A protein has these predicted regions:
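Acidic/histidine-rich alpha-helical segments that form the ligand environment
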Residues: 28-42, 97-135
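Cytochrome P450 catalytic-domain "roof"
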Residues: 42-51
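A short, mixed-charge helix-start or loop-turn motif at secondary-structure junctions
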Residues: 19-23, 101-108, 143-147
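Short, charged, low-complexity loops and linkers
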Residues: 12-28
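Short, contiguous alpha-helical
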Residues: 1-9, 13-16, 50-94, 120-123, ...
Length: 172
């Protein structure tokens, strides 16, 4: 069990996401989210996945691509810090990542499968994490993090976007 991150384990901004998660077992929370997320994504059709609630907003495909890319980037941060690397990591710009993904031209089912596989990889990383690794620290985007803060951030990020999908996109 990882325990919940303390205030000094991430910059205040990130607690917007971390605080959306209840419980204190990061690995279990990330694992529990998988079924709910896949159920939601599985109920969205190819046509619906191209829906945008406003012209300047991402499509559902772009939202899921963003969720997946962000999880991949943050899981790497968790791995980097857990293994004891000391070099700071650069920032992650979601707008650059989104622009480079061309997500609307990838089939919806492929996005869902990619999320599933990335999440399984994240679960495996966290399930096999040594107990003392959860409190190891590192720097990314010029901000301090612990591994457990990153894990809670991953879970909170999905919670945040699933909530937005339900409120603003679904039912389409």
């Amino acid at each position: 069990m990882s325990g919940r991150p303390k205030e000094d384990e991430a910059a205040p901004y990130y607690f917007t996401y971390i605080n959306q998660v209840t419980g204190d077992d990061a690995a279990g929370i990330v694992e529990d989210q998988l079924g709910e997320s896949l159920s939601l994504f599985g109920g969205i059709s190819e046509e619906q996945s191209l829906y945008r609630y406003a012209p300047d907003k991402w499509s559902i495909r772009q939202v899921l691509n963003h969720i997946t890319d962000t999880e991949r980037a943050f899981a790497f941060r968790a791995l980097w810090f857990a293994r004891g690397f000391e070099a700071p990591l650069p920032s992650y710009d979601q707008n650059i990542a989104s622009a480079g993904a061309n997500a609307d031209h990838v089939e919806w089912g492929a996005h869902v499968e990619e999320f599933h596989r990335v999440r399984l990889s994240t679960i495996s990383l966290f399930r096999n994490m040594p107990a003392d690794a959860w409190t190891r620290r590192g720097v990314a985007s010029d901000n301090p993090f612990t591994v457990r803060a990153v894990a809670f951030l991953i879970a909170g990020h999905v919670t945040h976007h699933v909530s937005i999908l339900r409120q603003r996109y679904l039912p389409v």
